[in-house]
């Protein structure tokens, strides 16, 4: 029986200078092409500028062997026959704040996250942002307290215990509550120390990682999609693209598309950590060799089965606000949108279910176009500032929820400043990367799933009218007087210049309980006639009678003067008119619609 190798991706994330690259190097036995600060700029500055990859292998633990489905392990050329191995691929993500785009790209291919903390400094800004990304994109966490060699020997254990308690408290309100925390010294003495200095705690860390790892569910079906992080040429062979398979599978001789360039190439050969293979599937990290392709055209990006990705100009996404982000998410605001392997600016419009559907079960993998949605001036959340939530009138005008009642699911229309190529149902992260990187604030604003991409450049005309997002409009006026038992005159609902003909046929409610229908304009001053199909109640007539009596007593010769006087006469108490209607945001005819 050939040896088998199961691949699991472990992300190494944390603040700049926390020792992530040194830790990955200490853990690794095999370095992949993109590993360990290969970029000259990165080596000079001592920070990781791109995703570095390396790996180590251990015998597959017995607890994982028994549950291993046959299709989840890929045959390899070199392991000892019959000895299945667990290959841990380490994804070393940069910790520099301005490179958060790269971190987000890396987190999407990670099965378990190692959060590296400098034990002398504790939780820092980028550590917190990495933790936020981990909560979105990852299920398991191991916290590594690095640089314990810098702690005074006599106080070392006390300092480690103190930081462990701090981290446990930090994780308490996250999905990673109770995650294991382990102290190490990846490179005792720091970067300048001689290589002879042995790392501390690495065997224990490997043991901990092995105990925490579970074999991810891998699915070879579906279209092939690979996240490419490095591209280079080999003389006489061709161009090699290295990366991790996000979905599907691939075999020798298959055709792949580089969607950003609209180029299709045939797979000539494949390698996984320097070992030739004939096929690979979701979760595997490999290099694909193609011919006649300039590696300079693609440093990072996506490679896929031909025509399986779409390029979109806008998208409908589900939205969930990141609680650590300060401030509201407002309609018309611009955010950095990370989708697929790209980060572009996008303008957002938020919307929610209609108020009656606020408690409906969230649908995570599709968008229902037959349903009506309520426009929102901003994402609804319980942490809105009092200045916003106290303004009930503004809330009503926008049709927003008051008293902290929030819908279980919300969405946004994102309009990208330039088209993006991405898979369907992919992760979307919105952030404010232009915020000051030195302030101690979370720049990650929201996350969600891309539910529907709009590929037509003219989507505003061809698609958006299908999207039934409405604003709820409320107008209030007064009944000036009754004309007879079945009609009244209203005022103060419209401006003088309003074309009242547009509102004819709309229903209004009187504060006395009657239902009326706008019948016609009355004069030129914005007044209008309302028909009351059920007639005025005796109580309403009593309120509105002063004007009727005055008109009845008026003599013929004084008709005009008395009519003017009657118009000025007020009822004994105000009767308020309420007009409520929907206006659909993308209706080109701007029609007003009322519920039956």
From Swiss-Prot:
Effect the entry attributes to changing residue 285 to Q: In NEDPSB; likely pathogenic; decreased selenocysteine incorporation in selenoproteins
Region of interest (G2), ranges: 46-50
Region of interest (Disordered), residue spans: 548-573
Region listing for G1, in residue ranges: 14-21
UniProt xrefs under CDD domains: eSelB_III (cd04094), SelB_euk (cd01889), SelB_II (cd03696)
Region ranges (G5): 185-187
Domain tr-type G: 5-217
UniProt keyword Phosphoprotein, yes or no: yes
Residues annotated as binding GTP: 19, 21-22, 149, 187
GO CC terms of this entry: cytoplasm; nucleus; ribonucleoprotein complex
Residues that bear Phosphoserine: 537
InterPro entries xref list: eEFSec_C, eEFSec_III, EF-Tu_GTPase, EFTu-like_2, P-loop_NTPase, T_Tr_GTP-bd_dom, Transl_B-barrel_sf
Amino acids binding Mg(2+): 21, 48, 92
Gene Ontology biological process: selenocysteine incorporation
Keywords: Cytoplasm, Disease variant, GTP-binding, Hydrolase, Intellectual disability, Methylation, Neurodegeneration, Nucleotide-binding, Nucleus, Phosphoprotein, Protein biosynthesis
Superkingdom field: Eukaryota
Listed Basic and acidic residues bias regions: 555-571
Protein name: Selenocysteine-specific elongation factor
Natural source organism: Homo sapiens
């Amino acid at each position: 029986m050939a040896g088998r190798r199961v691949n699991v991706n472990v992300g190494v994330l944390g603040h700049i200078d926390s020792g992530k690259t040194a830790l990955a190097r200490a853990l690794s036995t095999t370095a992949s092409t993109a590993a360990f600060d290969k970029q000259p700029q990165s080596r000079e500055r001592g920070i990781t500028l791109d995703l570095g990859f390396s790996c180590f292998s251990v015998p597959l633990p017995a607890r994982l062997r028994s549950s291993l489905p046959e299709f989840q392990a890929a045959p390899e050329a070199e392991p000892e026959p019959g000895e299945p191995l667990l290959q841990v691929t380490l994804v070393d993500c940069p910790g520099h704040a301005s490179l958060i785009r790269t971190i987000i790209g890396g987190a999407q291919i990670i099965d378990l996250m190692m959060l590296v903390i400098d034990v002398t400094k504790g939780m820092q800004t980028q550590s917190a942002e990495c933790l936020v990304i981990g909560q979105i994109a990852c299920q398991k966490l191991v916290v590594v307290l690095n640089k314990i060699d810098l702690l005074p020997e006599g106080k070392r254990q006390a300092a480690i215990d103190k930081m462990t308690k701090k981290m446990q408290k930090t994780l308490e309100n996250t999905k990673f509550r109770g995650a294991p925390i382990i102290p190490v010294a990846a490179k005792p003495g720091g970067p300048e120390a001689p290589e002879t200095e042995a790392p501390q705690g690495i065997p224990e860390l490997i043991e901990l990682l092995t105990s925490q790892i579970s074999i991810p569910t891998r699915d070879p079906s579906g279209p092939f999609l690979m996240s490419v992080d490095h591209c280079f040429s080999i003389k006489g062979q061709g161009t090699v693209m290295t990366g991790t398979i996000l979905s599907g599978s691939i075999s020798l001789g298959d055709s792949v598309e580089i969607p950003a360039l609209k180029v299709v190439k045939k797979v000539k050969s494949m390698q996984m950590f320097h070992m030739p293979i004939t096929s690979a599937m979701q979760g595997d990290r490999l290099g694909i060799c193609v011919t006649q392709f300039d590696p300079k055209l693609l440093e990072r990006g996506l490679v896929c089965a031909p025509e399986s990705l779409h390029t979109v100009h806008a998208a409908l996404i589900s939205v969930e606000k990141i609680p650590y982000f300060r401030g509201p998410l407002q309609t018309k605001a611009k955010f950095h949108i990370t989708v697929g392997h790209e980060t572009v600016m996008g303008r957002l419009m938020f919307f929610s279910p209609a108020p009656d559907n606020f408690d409906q079960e969230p649908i995570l993998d599709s968008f229902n176009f037959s349903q009506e949605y309520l426009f929102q001036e901003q994402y609804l959340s319980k942490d809105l500032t009092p200045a916003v939530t106290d303004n009930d009138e503004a809330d009503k005008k926008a049709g927003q929820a008051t008293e902290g009642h929030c819908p279980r699911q919300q969405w946004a229309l994102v309009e990208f400043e330039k088209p993006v190529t991405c898979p369907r149902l992919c992760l979307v992260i919105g952030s404010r990367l232009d915020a000051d990187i030195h302030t101690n604030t979370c720049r990650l604003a929201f996350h969600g799933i891309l539910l529907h991409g709009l590929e037509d450049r003219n989507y505003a005309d061809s698609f958006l009218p299908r999207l039934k997002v409405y604003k709820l409009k409320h107008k209030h006026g007064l009944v000036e007087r009754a004309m007879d038992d079945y009609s009244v005159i209203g005022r103060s609902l419209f401006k003088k210049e309003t074309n009242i003909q547009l509102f004819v046929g709309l229903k209004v409610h009187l504060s006395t309980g009657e239902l009326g229908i706008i019948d016609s304009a009355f004069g030129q001053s914005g007044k209008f006639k309302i028909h009351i199909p059920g007639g005025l109640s005796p109580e309403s007539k009593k309120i509105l009678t002063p004007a009727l009596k005055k008109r009845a007593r008026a003599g013929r010769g004084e008709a005009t003067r008395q009519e003017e006087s009657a118009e000025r006469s007020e009822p004994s108490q105000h009767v308020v008119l309420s007009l409520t209607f929907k206006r659909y945001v993308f209706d080109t005819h701007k029609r007003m619609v009322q519920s039956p």
